Regions:
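Conserved nucleotide-cofactor-binding alpha/beta core module
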Residues: 81-191
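Class I SAM-dependent transferase core
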Residues: 4-89, 97-101, 105, 118-128, ...
Length: 192
């Protein structure tokens, strides 16, 4: 059971995260700011990471996987300019934080996660948060989730060195794709 003091503390941390990490990075679009202020990041990390949920760094999810730092996620979302009618594929969704944030902006989100335990936890967390426009799909990240597409936007969590053709084929003509390149740069590519 969460105490009022703990809830207030996390709420203050969420506000501080946006004010000190997101806004100073020139991310000022209201839908992104509102979503990041609304989604309880601490609910989408392993319990051992809750106290670090709002730090300005990637959080380890285990197995070499990370939850992107708030600034990086916000910059990617800013570049994608997700609209209210967009269908979004969130690849490597982990415990569901990014999908929850995106769900505030898009008509629907498919959260793809290959780790079955993470996928199950993501689904439970998203349901508990009232995110009824997110589908959690368990499967290989490199395969995408074609049965739910095609997608207006595809976002990849974590670094990749190349984009699998199977994923590119799931992007609508004129759709947007964003990922972090393995050397640390943000890449946004328009296909169509």
């Amino acid at each position: 059971r969460t105490s009022l003091a703990a809830m207030t503390d996390y709420s203050a941390r969420r506000t501080m995260m946006v004010d000190t990490q997101v806004r100073p990075s020139d991310v000022t679009k209201f839908p992104i700011i509102d979503a990041m202020l609304s989604v309880k990041r601490e609910d989408f990390v392993p319990s051992a990471q809750r106290e670090a949920a709002y730090m300005g760094e990637n959080l380890s999810l285990g197995g070499g996987r990370v939850l992107l730092e708030p600034r990086t996620l916000a910059k990617m979302l800013d570049a994608l300019d997700i609209g209210a009618d967009d269908l979004v594929l969130d690849i490597g969704a982990g415990y569901g934080y990014s999908a929850a944030v995106i769900a505030h902006m898009a008509v629907a989100v498919v959260a793809l996660e290959e780790d079955e335990d993470m996928a199950r936890d993501a689904e439970e967390g998203l349901m508990a948060a009232g995110m009824d426009n997110v589908i959690v799909h368990a499967g290989p990240l490199s395969a995408g989730a074609a049965e739910h597409g095609p997608y207006d936007v595809i976002l990849v969590q974590g670094g990749i060195s190349d984009i699998p053709d199977a994923v590119i084929d799931q992007l609508k003509d004129g759709g947007l794709f964003a990922c972090r390149c393995l050397f640390g740069a943000l890449g946004v590519v328009r296909f169509g």
